[in-house]
UniProtKB/Swiss-Prot annotation:
The lineage of its organism: Eukaryota, Viridiplantae, Chlorophyta, core chlorophytes, Chlorophyceae. This is Molybdate transporter 1. Induction: Up-regulated by nitrate, but not by molybdate. High affinity molybdate transporter. Acts through an energy-dependent process. The gene is MOT1. 60% inhibition by 20 uM tungstate or by lack of glucose in the medium, but no inhibition by sulfate. Signal peptide: none annotated. InterPro entries: MOT1/MOT2. GO terms for molecular function: molybdate ion transmembrane transporter activity. It is a multi-pass membrane protein. It is found in: Membrane.
Length: 519
C-alpha cells in the first residue's frame, strides 16, 4: 500500500510538472550549460571521465534537486577540483584522485550539514561579504565567457577568432549581443529623463547649445523632438518599480531595498530575465543550444553516424588511501571553501533573495544544512559510480533564473534530458559535444556571470557595498576565493572593533567626545 501511494504521488507530481512547464522554464533549464559543458568535455578528454555515466548520474541529481527544493537549484561541477585536474602535470589529478577529492569534500560538507554547524556559519557571515564573493566569481565567469566567445586558446594559434565559420568571431559577437539584448530587464523610466540615463539611455536633451535645432530634428527614440515620449507598456513610476522590487523578495527576510531594486522587480515581474526589450520572455538559452547543435551537425554531418546506441557501464571507484590523500590535498582542500561558501551559503542567500515571497515552509527546503546534506548525499552515491563530483551553486541558480526558470520544473526537465541522453548514447555523445560551437557556450557563460555578479545590487547601504567591494577586490587581486573571503571578514571585524572602541571611549570620557563633537 505504501509503495502504491508513493507511486500515485509520483505520477501526480509528474503530471503537475508537465502541465506547468513553460518555454521560459525550458530555456531556464539550459541556462547553466555554459559552465557545465566546457568542464565536462575537458574532463572527458583529459582524465577519461565516463561521459555517459556522468550525464546519467548528474541528470538524476537534477531531478532530485528540482523535486526537493522546488526552485531552479542547479547542479554544477566542483570547479576547483576540475581546474586542478585539467591543469595536468605533477600537480594535477588523475581520474581516481579526482573522484576521491569529490568524496573528501562531500564528507566534510556532510558533517557540517548533519551537525547544523553550517547554519551557524550562515548566521555569522555578513551578507555583504557573501555578495562580494558572488561579485568576484561572477566577474570571473563573465570574463571567461567573453574570452571564450571572441578569442582562441591552445592549438597552433592563439588570439582573435577568425571572422567566419561555426567557431568564428561573427558567431561569438552576434551570440553575445543577442544574449544581452534578450535578457536585459525592461525599461523602468521614461526616455529623456535622468532615470533613463541611469538605465543606459539618453537623459534630458541639452537646451542651451548651438546643436539644439539639430537635436529637435532627431527621431524621438534618439532623444529628439519637443518632449520625450512615454513608451507604451515600458514606463514604470519609481514608486511602482520599488513596489515590484519589494514584492520579488530580497534579503534573508525576503525584502530587497526599494531604491536600488527597480531593475530586479521589473525583470522578475515583467519578463526581464530571459525576455528582452520589455516584452514576453524569449527562450534565448534554448535557442542558443538548438542553433549550436544544428551548426555542429551542419558543419560535420558525419557526427550523427558516430553516435552509438546504448549506455556505458559504470566504472566503480576502488578505494585507495594514496589516491584519497593526493586528491584531498591537491583538489579537495582548495575546493572546500568554495563549496561551503558558494554552493551552500551563497546559494541559500541568493535563493532567499530571488524567492523570498514563498512561504516559510517552502524556504526551509533550502536552508543551509539541507543544501549541505544534498551535496554530501548526491556525491556520496554518484562518485562511487565514476560520476563527476558536483555541487549546487549560486552562479547556476542565477543563470537558470536569468533565462526564465522559476520553479523546480526546470532542473527536473534538464535532468530527464541528461539522463535520457546518457542512457541512449552513453559516451559516444562526446563527439557531438566537442563539435558544439565554443562562441555560443561563451555567450551563455557571460550572461550567467553577469547575473551572478549583479546580486551585489541587493545590498542595502553604502556601508554594505564597501564590504562587498573589498571582498570582491581581494578575491580578484589574490586569485583565491578563500583568502579574499577572509579579507572581507577581517575588514568587517576591524570596523566593528574600531566602532566598539570608539563607543567604549565615548562612554568612559563623555566630556572629551562632547567637546570634539562641538568642535
Amino acid at each position: 500500500m505504501a509503495l502504491q501511494n508513493a507511486w500515485q504521488n509520483t505520477k501526480e507530481r509528474a503530471r503537475e510538472t508537465w502541465a506547468q512547464l513553460t518555454w521560459s522554464e525550458v530555456s531556464g533549464s539550459l541556462g547553466d550549460l555554459g559552465t557545465f559543458l566546457p568542464l565536462l568535455i575537458g574532463l572527458v578528454q583529459k582524465v577519461h571521465l565516463d561521459l555517459g555515466t556522468t550525464l546519467t548520474i548528474t541528470g538524476l541529481y537534477n531531478i532530485i534537486s528540482g523535486w526537493q527544493f522546488r526552485i531552479p537549484m542547479c547542479v554544477q561541477p566542483m570547479k576547483t577540483i576540475a581546474a586542478v585536474a585539467l591543469a595536468g602535470g605533477a600537480a594535477g589529478l588523475d581520474l581516481p584522485q579526482l573522484l576521491h577529492a569529490g568524496l573528501f569534500v562531500a564528507g566534510c560538507v556532510g558533517l557540517l550539514g548533519a551537525s547544523q554547524a553550517i547554519d551557524l556559519f550562515n548566521w555569522l557571515v555578513p551578507p555583504p561579504v557573501i555578495r562580494g564573493v558572488q561579485l568576484a566569481v561572477g566577474v570571473k565567469l563573465a570574463m571567461k565567457g567573453v574570452d571564450m566567445a571572441l578569442r582562441l586558446h591552445g592549438g597552433p594559434s592563439s588570439g582573435w577568432r577568425p571572422w567566419l565559420g561555426t567557431e568564428g568571431l561573427v558567431v561569438g559577437a552576434v551570440a553575445l549581443a543577442a544574449m544581452i539584448a534578450t535578457t536585459l530587464p525592461p525599461r523602468a523610466a521614461r526616455r529623456g529623463t535622468l532615470e533613463a540615463a541611469d538605465e543606459g539611455g539618453l537623459g534630458p536633451r541639452p537646451t542651451d547649445t548651438a546643436f539644439e535645432p539639430l537635436l529637435r530634428r532627431l527621431p524621438a527614440c534618439c532623444g529628439g523632438g519637443d518632449r520625450a515620449p512615454q513608451v507604451e507598456g515600458a514606463a514604470v513610476s519609481a514608486e511602482r518599480a520599488g513596489l515590484l522590487a519589494h514584492a520579488e523578495g530580497g534579503e534573508r527576510s525576503g525584502n530587497l531595498d526599494d531604491g536600488t531594486e527597480a531593475g530586479v522587480g521589473a525583470a522578475a515581474g515583467g519578463g526581464g530575465c530571459g525576455g528582452g526589450g520589455g516584452g514576453g520572455r524569449i527562450p534565448s538559452a534554448l535557442i542558443a543550444v538548438v542553433v549550436g547543435l544544428a551548426m555542429a551537425v551542419l558543419h560535420r554531418p558525419g557526427l550523427v553516424w558516430e553516435l552509438r546506441l546504448g549506455p556505458t557501464l559504470p566504472r566503480l571507484l576502488r578505494p585507495s588511501w594514496p589516491d584519497f590523500k593526493t586528491g584531498a590535498l591537491r583538489g579537495g582542500l582548495p575546493q572546500l571553501p568554495l563549496t561551503t561558501l558558494n554552493s551552500v551559503i551563497a546559494v541559500t542567500q541568493l535563493a532567499n533573495a530571488l524567492f523570498g515571497d514563498k512561504p516559510e515552509a517552502e524556504r526551509r527546503r533550502w536552508r543551509p544544512s539541507a543544501v549541505a546534506l544534498s551535496v554530501a548525499l548526491l556525491n556520496g552515491a554518484g562518485v562511487w559510480l565514476g560520476a563527476m563530483p558536483c555541487c549546487h551553486g549560486a552562479g547556476g541558480l542565477a543563470a537558470q533564473y536569468k533565462f526564465g526558470a522559476r520553479t523546480g520544473h526546470a532542473p527536473i526537465l534538464l535532468g530527464c534530458i541528461k539522463a535520457a541522453l546518457g542512457l541512449l548514447f552513453g559516451g559516444s555523445l562526446v563527439v557531438l559535444l566537442e563539435a558544439f560551437p565554443q562562441p555560443l557556450l561563451g555567450a551563455l557563460l557571460t550572461v550567467s556571470g553577469i547575473e551572478l555578479a549583479s546580486v551585489v545590487r541587493h545590498t542595502r547601504s553604502p556601508r554594505g557595498y564597501t564590504f562587498a567591494l573589498l571582498t570582491a577586490v581581494a578575491i580578484l587581486a589574490l586569485d583565491n576565493t578563500g583568502t579574499g573571503f577572509l579579507v572581507g571578514l577581517v575588514g568587517v571585524a576591524a570596523v566593528a572593533a574600531y566602532e566598539g572602541a570608539v563607543a567604549a571611549a565615548a562612554a568612559r570620557w563623555p566630556r572629551v567626545f562632547a567637546r570634539g563633537g562641538r568642535a
